[in-house]
A protein has these predicted regions:
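Acidic, surface-exposed loops and disordered segments
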Residues: 6, 14, 18-209
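Bacterial N-terminal signal peptides that target proteins for export
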Residues: 1-8
C-alpha cells in the first residue's frame, strides 16, 4: 500500500511538471529576452578573425538540435569547420570561378568572411527535412546572437561545393550519410560591424476572420 501511495505521488508530480507553462524570460530592463534577441538580430558580414570557441559552438548546436522537427526524425547532419586553412582553400577555388569577388576590399572568404562555418545537410528521403533544417538553423542563429556571436545564413557556398568538382572533394571529406545533401551553410563569428535593421513588410501578414 505504501508503495502504491508513493507511485501515485510521483505520477502527480510528473503530471504537474509536464503541464507547467513556460515562464517569461525577461532582461534586466523588463523586456522579453527572446523577443529582444529576435528583433535585434542582424546578418553579419564583417567579423573579427578569431574562430568561435568550440565550447560555445557546442552550446549553439545543442540549441539547434532541440528545434521542433517532424516526428522527431531529426533529419539533419551538421559539420562545423573552424580550420582557417580549409576555409582558405575553398575560398581559392571559389575565386577561380568568381574572380571579380577578389576586387571587393571587404572580401576575405566565400562564407561572408566568417571564421567558423556550420554545414547543414538534410535527409533527402524525408520530405520535411528542409523545413526541419531551417528550424534548426534559426535556433542556432538566435542562440548565437544571444551570446554576442554574429552569423549569416548562406545558400551559395552549398551550391558551389556541390557543383565544383574540386570543392566537392572537400564536401565528400565531410562524410555526410547516404541520402544526405548539403542544404545550407551558416557562418559564425564575433561581429566587426553593427548592421542596421532593414525594413520588413508587415502587410504580408493578414489575420483571417
Amino acid at each position: 500500500m505504501k508503495a502504491l501511495k508513493t507511485l501515485v505521488s510521483i505520477l502527480c508530480v510528473c503530471s504537474l511538471c509536464s503541464c507547467t507553462p513556460a515562464q517569461e524570460n525577461k532582461t534586466d530592463d523588463g523586456k522579453n529576452a527572446v523577443i529582444e534577441t529576435i528583433m535585434t538580430r542582424r546578418s553579419v558580414r564583417k567579423y573579427q578573425p578569431q574562430a568561435v570557441n568550440r565550447d560555445t559552438m557546442q552550446i549553439i548546436m545543442d540549441c539547434g538540435i532541440n528545434a521542433p522537427n517532424a516526428i522527431n526524425r531529426q533529419a539533419w547532419e551538421v559539420r562545423i569547420v573552424d580550420n582557417p586553412e580549409v576555409i582558405q582553400k575553398l575560398t581559392e577555388l571559389y575565386l577561380k570561378d568568381n574572380p571579380k569577388e577578389a576586387e571587393n576590399p571587404n572580401f576575405k572568404n566565400m562564407f561572408r568572411n566568417a571564421p567558423t562555418v556550420a554545414f547543414i545537410a538534410n535527409d533527402t528521403s524525408f520530405a520535411y527535412s528542409p523545413v526541419d533544417c531551417g528550424l534548426m538553423a534559426e535556433n542556432m542563429i538566435l542562440s548565437a546572437w544571444s551570446m554576442g556571436i554574429g552569423s549569416v545564413c548562406l545558400g551559395g557556398p552549398a551550391r558551389f561545393m556541390k557543383s565544383n568538382p574540386e570543392a566537392n572533394a572537400y564536401l565528400k571529406e565531410m562524410g555526410f550519410s547516404e541520402n544526405y545533401d548539403l542544404l545550407l551553410c551558416i557562418g559564425f563569428g564575433y561581429p566587426a560591424e553593427t548592421p542596421k535593421a532593414k525594413p520588413r513588410d508587415a502587410a504580408k501578414v493578414k489575420f483571417m476572420d
